[in-house]
């Protein structure tokens, strides 16, 4: 079930909301929690019920391991239990997500012909795997998981607003909210805030992101070759599509959770305003950055083992981050590039160099935009097609109306024709300009939410945004991070 679907907005969400609070009103607290877990599992099963046993088995397995890790006088080594638990989780993720990638590489290296398994990736497996690994690690290190019962644990893992594509929540920020007595009563302020931010997220997805998606798809998947302007229109369209799609999803998740008086962590903080790559990762997919830092980078030694080890740890962390996103060498290389950029930034900072703010932003944004090409491309041919175009190696074409004044450029190989016809039209660049204005000038959703005043004009604005988005739900599309 998609957030941007009629059945979710007009059936599932209101039904779940009213039944949950009705049960709480009758002081059937545990029943209400159980209902919310069952509703979340129904929400998860909407795509493919065949994987329902997978998430159920995963929860039972990890909860039991957590209980064992919390025992003070366990007969089995905690280190052994933790390693076994982490390995089991990673093997499950690896089997479904990376089997065909592994087989492809074995076939290439050894010239074999092992058939692919062609497994359907279980929804949200990357997210609930990381979430539960963090739980196991904290259970082993005294991270305050001892008091959780199985029902609360299930609610922590399955709570439907964050289940499918994050944010990657931590038990310490979720469990106390589920236990808070005040959160069992309808809070009209939270309803207003939730509906507002949900509407903003819906608008981001169906009006903005899905518009950019058309041009990104044309460039990456349909065009055989791209000239300079087409290539830049393609890469920038995907850069904005990904941001508005994923941040739109997170806004909708935050809004839906607020209806139940649950505050999810902020996952985006105007990442395209970043002035360096470290700043970007403090603003983009914040909960993933937190997980990578706390459960990979710091356990590897962080910055406590000397400069060289710090650089190696940064590289390893972001290569793992790349692999987590997808089973392909383009994802690995994307993670590698970000690791290299972070190492260069650290060296630059250690040397005490400074840079003009605009230049710093320009370099950072273009690095991010170029590396998203590796993230989006289906294979290396698509990468080369887009990058060749971006660097002018596939020709430069200007609009026909400029030929009268700039015709002399034709002797230098510049053509005059429909300069973005394989991707979009002139409106594409107007929309890209609109995208830049939105991400660089306007406040982000979290900032708006903090300063929101309950006024008539706010209600009117929210209503217009919501209604316009609803009427734009002609072609319902999945969120991009559902594939990760």
Tell me what each language-model feature is.
Residues 1-439, 447-483:
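Membrane-embedded transmembrane alpha-helical bundles that form the catalytic cores
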């Amino acid at each position: 079930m998609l957030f941007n679907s009629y059945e979710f907005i007009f059936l599932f969400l209101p039904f779940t909301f009213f039944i949950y609070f009705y049960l709480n009103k009758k002081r059937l607290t545990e029943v209400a929690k159980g209902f919310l877990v069952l509703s979340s599992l129904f929400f998860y099963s909407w795509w493919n019920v065949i994987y329902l046993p997978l998430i159920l088995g995963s929860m039972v397995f990890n909860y039991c391991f957590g209980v064992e890790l919390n025992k003070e006088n366990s007969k089995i080594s905690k280190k052994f239990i933790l390693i076994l638990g982490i390995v089991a989780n990673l093997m499950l993720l690896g089997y479904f997500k990376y089997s065909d990638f592994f087989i492809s590489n074995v076939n290439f290296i050894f010239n074999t012909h092992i058939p692919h398994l062609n497994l359907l990736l279980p929804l949200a497996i990357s997210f609930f795997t990381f979430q539960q690994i963090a739980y196991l690690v904290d259970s082993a290190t005294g991270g305050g998981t001892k008091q959780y019962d199985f029902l609360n644990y299930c609610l922590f893992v399955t709570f439907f607003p964050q289940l499918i594509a994050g944010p990657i929540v931590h038990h310490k920020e979720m469990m106390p909210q589920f236990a808070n007595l005040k959160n069992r009563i309808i809070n009209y302020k939270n309803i207003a805030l939730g509906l507002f931010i949900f509407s903003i997220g819906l608008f981001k997805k169906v009006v903005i992101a899905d518009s950019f998606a058309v041009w990104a798809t044309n460039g990456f998947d349909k065009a055989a070759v791209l000239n300079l302007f087409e290539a830049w229109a393609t890469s920038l369209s995907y850069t904005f599509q990904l941001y508005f799609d994923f941040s739109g999803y997170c806004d909708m998740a935050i809004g839906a959770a607020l209806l139940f008086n649950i505050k999810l962590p902020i996952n985006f903080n105007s990442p395209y305003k970043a002035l360096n790559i470290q700043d970007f990762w403090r603003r983009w997919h914040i909960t993933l950055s937190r997980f990578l830092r706390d459960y990979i980078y710091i356990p590897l030694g962080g910055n406590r083992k000397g400069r060289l080890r710090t650089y190696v740890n940064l590289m390893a962390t972001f290569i793992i981050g790349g692999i987590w996103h997808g089973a392909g060498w383009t994802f690995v290389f994307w993670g590698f590039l970000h690791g290299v950029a972070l190492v260069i930034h650290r060296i630059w900072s250690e040397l005490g160099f400074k840079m003009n703010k605009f230049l710093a932003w320009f370099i950072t944004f273009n690095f991010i935009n170029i590396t998203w090409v590796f993230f989006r491309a289906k294979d290396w041919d698509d990468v080369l097609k887009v990058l060749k175009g971006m660097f002018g190696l596939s020709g430069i074409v200007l609009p026909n109306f400029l030929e009268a004044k700039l015709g002399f450029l034709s002797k230098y190989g510049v053509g005059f024709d429909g300069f973005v016809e394989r991707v979009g039209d002139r409106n594409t660049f107007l929309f890209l300009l609109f995208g830049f204005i939105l991400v660089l000038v306007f406040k982000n959703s979290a900032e708006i939410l903090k300063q929101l005043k309950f006024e008539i004009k706010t209600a009117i604005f929210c209503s217009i945004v919501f209604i316009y988005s609803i009427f734009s739900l002609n072609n319902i599309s999945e969120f991009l991070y559902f594939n990760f």
